[in-house]
Amino acid sequence: MVINRYTVSCGTCQTNHTLRISLGTDRYQEHTFPCVNCGEDMSVRLDIDFDDWGKFDNLPGFKAPKTKFSTVSNCEVCQAEGTVINLDPNFLVTENFLHDQYYFSSLHQAERLGAFERIEKTKDYFSGKQILDIFSLVGGFRNLREKLEFLIKAWSLHNRGKENLALEYLDKLAEDLFDKSYPLHESIQMFSALFIGEERSEEMKTILNEIKEAKSKNSLQYYNLRSYYLEEHVEDCLERHLESFTDYLKNYDDLLQLYLYAKQKQKIPEDISLSSKRFRNLKMFYGNIYEHITSSIFILAGINNILSGRNFDMFEQMDLKKYMTINKANRANPFKDRHSFDPVVKCLDSTLRNASHHGAMKLQINSNIIQYRSGGTGALNSISYTEYLQKCNEMMFSSCMLLIVELMILKNWI
């Protein structure tokens, strides 16, 4: 809950801004925001050294990590104060308090996310000298960006046969996250479970129980499905999941703002402002991850076939070969009545996918509203950028849930 104060001037119109930046939970954070005068984007960066803490001269007993502030684009450090802008990497900023010099977004939004109710239930947070970590209380975990980097690096090194190097990064991933270092697939599975959170982990158990039932009901067909996955799809499927994690990391600063809200399935507050808005980088994220998910849900379709008393590759009206050629927007239809699979597919929106995949989306000037057309030529639709970020996070959670399913089948952990 530490806020640092910096002054910068816009590189386009020289308007001064006073930035009140909340220190987040990663070793660095970037914010891209519009100038209050000309509207052109400015970007700044804050590096945080959690290994080096300094004291406050006017607050005896309080410490904060040392930081390094730098400008990234279209602004420079200045001495004069300007319009106050509150920026927070982890929590949304309430619109009415965007320019309030006394506002603490983390406290305000943590209350919305139920942090204080959890404090009452978790007295350990007040024991001894333990620090109250609001971000962890509401479902986050520290150094998420760095942990994503370690996971992606280990995965990439493994794919190129650099096992010794991969193990080094798996060790880094495990530090302060797992009880010990684990092999790659176990690490991916455990990280994915942490990433999606407790509520979705419970939904994940229900899905895995369905898979266990399919295996018990017809083990021959279950292992035929597993063989089909291993022989025809495993490399492509896992590569797509790696790409999804990589895309998430590339757009981390924007996506993290809605991570907690999506993780808790919270309704987005209407009176909020974003602390980073790099829409150009993110406009194709939804479409890409939609493609990844719908290319892999044949596994759930196969499990549904077995549970329905059929061979894994036989649907009510087609076989698997035909199924793999139908429009991806329709690939969840064969199991639409098996609601235990809904958590993986209910976030799929083919209209938004078409617009995102074809780049047919535009963030309106001086606005938080995205307008888009399906396929670039369909009816005009609109969505707030905040809601778009929430949907992108929900898609990432769905991808992680599907990845867990694939790993459980791949490793024969069912």
Question: Model-derived features: where do they sit?
Answer:
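Histidine-centered, metal-coordinating catalytic motifs and their short helical/loop contexts
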Residues: 341-370
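Non-transmembrane, amphipathic alpha-helical segments
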Residues: 237, 274-288, 387
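Flexible secondary-structure boundary motifs
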Residues: 5-7, 282-346, 360
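Extended intrinsically disordered or low-complexity regions, especially N/C-terminal cytosolic tails and loops
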Residues: 1-276
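Short, flexible loop/turn elements at secondary-structure junctions
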Residues: 14, 357-361, 374-376
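Short, charged/polar, low-complexity loop and linker segments
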Residues: 268-277, 327-338, 375-379
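Functional cleft and adjacent loop/helix regions within the main domain
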Residues: 326-337, 351-352, 366-370, 381-385
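Amphipathic, Lys/Arg-enriched alpha-helical patches that create a basic surface
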Residues: 12, 37, 43, 51, ...
